Amino acid sequence: MAKDLKFLRNIGIMAHIDAGKTTTTERILYYTGLTHKIGEVHEGGAVMDWMEQEQERGITITAAATTTFWKYPTVQGQVTKDTQQYSINIIDTPGHVDFTVEVERSLRVLDGAVALFCAVSGVEPQSETVWRQADKYRVPRICFVNKMDRAGADFFNAVSEIKSKLGANPIPLQIPIGSEDTFKGVVDLIRNQAIIWNDEDLGMTYQVVPIPEDLKETVEEYRQKLMESVAEYDEVLLEKYFNDPNTITTEEIMVAIRKAVIDMSISPVLCGASFKNKGVQALLDAVCTYLPSPLDLPPVQGTNPDTEEKQIRKPDVNEPFAALAFKIATDPFVGRLAFMRVYSGKLDGSSYVYNNRTGKKERISRLMQMHANKQNPIDSIEAGDICAAVGFKDIRTGDTLTDEKNKIILESIVFPEPVIGYSIEPKKQADVDKLSMAISKLVEEDPTLHVETNEETGQTVMKGMGELHLEIIIDRLRREFKLEINQGAPQVAYKEALTSTIEHKEVYKKQTGGRGKFADIVFELGPREDGQMGLQFTNEIVGGAIPREFIPAIQKGFAAAMANGPLASYPVESMKVKLIHGSFHEVDSDSLSFELAARIGFKEAAKKASPVIMEPIMAVEVTTPDEFTGPVTGDLNKRRGIMRGMDAKGNTQVVKADVPLSELFGYVTDLRTITSGRAAATLTFSRYEQVPKQLADSIVEKVKGTANK
């Protein structure tokens, strides 16, 4: 019998690093009975942080998926006749900016999210990045202000920052009773009652007590705001609100909040202290009450690859099967694991699925429900499920899996380009092939990891999203694949750009006895005016000067040539080519001749199109005590930083600047020295900008010098 999707939640837990995501997830697993003891991040025992590097560093690197169950509603933890069992698929995502890809691919397949904020720090830079990603995928969310027990905790400041920094509409559903070491409970604004958690049973039960006198005014103010906010989303409530607000029932308020959350008009805010076991059960109740089930969201849309017609798939087991592979991982015991979100239909274990990217059928050998890195075998999966499958020979992140007779391609996942690289080689020559195999496995798992061979130096260059990202990859090569690696100094992922448009004629001729080679093209080449990436190719040839069958080869030649720019062989990411004239030879012309003419023509023409070197610019935010503001800003200025302003937060300043990545290697260590370890920095990729002429010349000289060695 198909499960009732009304009681299914696919959620993610997202936040800035150190906001308490993994600790909150561990408490959820404890309270839902999936673990019998609480794992602590600082002890390296968190269930969801299962990679060795995660347990050592106390940060989450990969998005671990877990299925758990929660009974709701209950009274003091006891079931009633109205209690239902909810199935909750939780994806715990990393907060470090280098692992944004894990957040991106998780949000693509979620129905709702819990956004965690630290009561002390409020909205931090990575919170803003993740919030924007959730907006992009239209993921409804509820907010949880964590760490209310910490010195400097300020619930109302956090709510204010959610509004001002994220442009959200936060509506508190609770008001904290006390803060810092006096935090002991909350006032539930919907039921208008105070709740104090019992420490004896780790917060499993609570006492309902009178609302403290000193909070009554604040409670009245925020309850009024809550009523006003939800009344706007329901005409019946609005009428009741104006006539007699006291007639509005708890159930009506909750239904209105749910409606407003699902259409992303509001973000309810709860609070607690996960580490002290306070507030997590109410958060689980809120997940069940306010976040959508697969049935509450519009059917997923896609395209039929054969007809290119738009199609939809409803979350129903009777619809044709459709799933999206959102993560590939390698398990030492079962091999390649493909994590999937099933949008429609049903799939039994040991059956075949059709991969719309490869155009091939593959047999799944096993289906599994995941609990961090442990697998529980299951017989089948159906609409709404998040699970893992074993048996794929060729699978990539973003692949759509269907049955062969009902094809559909769902919107894939777009990942950012890497900005930093290291040259790598094995310490032992005998390990060259082993390294190649290991790297191809890691690249399969991580779409933001790129590996390429520098044609001129012969070096293998591994590129990623930041120093920590690549450090962890090299660590994995050592631990998982037993490889010893030599790595070069960090390399910036420079790019090249054309800044003027020129016309060029290229004639490619080769005569070696017998049939020769001939192609003649005249084209305009320059920067795109629309600011988009890639090649914008237009064919303006009339009268058959070049036969139509050769045009795709010309386009292919230009697209391939963009990989090596004219100055220092860095890629040209964006350009336009207008093919305006040319000629061909009846016998000697073929597709390859025209492709080569385009490649050679690009090389010659690009030199004359005012090429420049582009460098990645990072948005840097440094949180520092007031007394170090001067040294911090001075240091950023020395690094060619452009200041974007400062925000005061108590006795600290948040210094914001845009700084070229090339000036930031080892910055975190230097910052520690400047501020005696009292400042923290986040570096987020912002954009590419032109390198100043003098520096560009030295970059080109350096590349040419390396190539000539």
Swiss-Prot record:
It is found in: Cytoplasm. GO terms for molecular function: GTP binding; GTPase activity; translation elongation factor activity. Keywords: Cytoplasm, Elongation factor, GTP-binding, Nucleotide-binding, Protein biosynthesis. GO terms for cellular component: cytoplasm. SUPFAM superfamilies: EF-G C-terminal domain-like, P-loop containing nucleoside triphosphate hydrolases, Ribosomal protein S5 domain 2-like, Translation proteins. Catalyzes the GTP-dependent ribosomal translocation step during translation elongation. During this step, the ribosome changes from the pre-translocational (PRE) to the post-translocational (POST) state as the newly formed A-site-bound peptidyl-tRNA and P-site-bound deacylated tRNA move to the P and E sites, respectively. Catalyzes the coordinated movement of the two tRNA molecules, the mRNA and conformational changes in the ribosome. HAMAP family: EF_G_EF_2_B. This is Elongation factor G. It comes from Amoebophilus asiaticus (strain 5a2).
